[in-house]
């Protein structure tokens, strides 16, 4: 049974795949292969490390392949976090800024290919507190623009190499599907011209989450996220709203600018065996700079969904 943790196995591995439908990618077939392992099997307090291979194809020509994971060294003294992926997607673009995103007449087609490699290595300074360097490589290629004027003269293809520093406080009980604890991470990223970047910019990203059991099978989860970029930020690396984790239902990238901010509160309820449900409410906005944040541009978000736990403490 993939939903039972196999502590006697050095590497607990499971695979799940199936059809899906969304308004963006239409009908598709997704696959996730997830593994859990412990670097010190005698340490019951050390959370398991994890690795996932994920892929997707759909009827509109979308394809995705990637691998991500968190490797926790013995005694949790160090952490290696990584995410590598590439995808191709017939996408939509509205331009930069709130007004462009809110204007439905700006909707334009283009083809997008993107690849990213992101790695960080964290050193533990104190209980639950880590610091370490990170490196990011991005390649973004846009083609066949329906309305090229919306790109405002920016290059369709960009290659970007970044170095940075991460600060982390993490008291979650489980990295992939927490039921209690705090998570706070600050990433400071630098993309200078001397690394070969055509667009020199920097960014500051803050992600914080809180998890609290409320009753049997129920977990209250709160999240706040902001991404601020400075300098000559390329279109493909601007802050955006919309993902499978926050501001769900908004087309990812419709609202994009040099800064974005969103918050969400979610109630998760285990129902039966692997099945669960969730309801959430949140809000988000974008802005060219933090000083130009305006409440009238805040977008609401709310809904409910189904949660499937195909592996113990790993949701699909």
Regions found by a protein language model. Give the residues of each.
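Gram-negative/organellar outer-membrane beta-barrel architecture
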Residues: 5-14, 20-155, 159, 254-257, ...
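Short loop/turn motifs that connect adjacent beta-strands in outer-membrane beta-barrel proteins
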Residues: 2-11, 39-48, 74-79, 127-128, ...
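C-terminal beta-signal and terminal closure region of outer-membrane beta-barrel proteins
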Residues: 294-316
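Transmembrane beta-strands of outer-membrane beta-barrel pores
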Residues: 21-23, 35-37, 55-61, 71-73, ...
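Outer-membrane beta-barrel proteins
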Residues: 28, 42, 78, 89-95, ...
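Flexible, surface-exposed loop regions and adjacent strand-edge segments
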Residues: 87, 97-103, 148-154, 203-205, ...
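Residues on the lipid-exposed face of transmembrane beta-strands in outer-membrane beta-barrel proteins
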Residues: 17-19, 31-35, 67-71, 117-123, ...
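C-terminal outer-membrane beta-barrel translocator/porin domains of Gram-negative envelope proteins
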Residues: 163-168, 172-272, 277-280, 287-288
């Amino acid at each position: 049974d993939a939903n039972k943790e196999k502590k006697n196995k050095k590497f607990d591995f499971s695979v799940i795949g199936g059809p899906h439908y969304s308004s963006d990618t239409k009908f598709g077939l997704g696959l996730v292969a997830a593994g859990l392992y412990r670097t010190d099997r005698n340490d019951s307090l050390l959370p398991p490390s994890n690795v996932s291979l994920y892929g997707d194809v759909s009827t509109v020509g979308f394809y995705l392949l990637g691998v991500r994971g968190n490797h926790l060294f013995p005694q949790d003294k160090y952490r290696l976090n990584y995410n590598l992926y590439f995808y191709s997607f017939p996408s939509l673009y509205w331009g930069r800024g709130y007004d462009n995103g809110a204007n439905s007449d700006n909707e334009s087609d283009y083809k997008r290919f993107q690849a990213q490699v992101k790695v960080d290595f964290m050193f533990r300074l104190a209980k639950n507190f880590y610091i370490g360097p990170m490196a990011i490589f991005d390649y973004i290629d846009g083609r066949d623009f329906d309305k090229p004027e919306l790109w405002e003269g920016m290059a369709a293809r960009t290659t970007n190499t970044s170095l940075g520093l991460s600060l982390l406080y993490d008291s979650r009980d489980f990295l992939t599907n927490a039921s209690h604890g705090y998570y706070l991470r600050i990433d400071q990223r630098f993309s200078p011209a001397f690394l070969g970047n055509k667009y020199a910019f920097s960014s500051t990203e803050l992600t914080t989450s809180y998890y609290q059991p409320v009753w049997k099978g129920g977990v209250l989860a709160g999240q706040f996220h902001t991404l601020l970029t400075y300098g000559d930020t390329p279109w493909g690396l601007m802050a955006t709203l919309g993902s499978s984790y926050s501001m769900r239902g908004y087309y990812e990238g419709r609202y994009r600018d040099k800064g974005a901010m969103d918050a969400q509160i979610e109630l998760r309820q285990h129902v039966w065996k692997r099945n669960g449900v969730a309801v959430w409410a949140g809000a988000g906005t974008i802005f060219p700079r933090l000083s130009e944040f305006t409440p009238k541009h805040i977008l609401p978000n709310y809904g409910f969904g189904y949660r499937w736990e195909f592996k113990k403490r790993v949701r699909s």
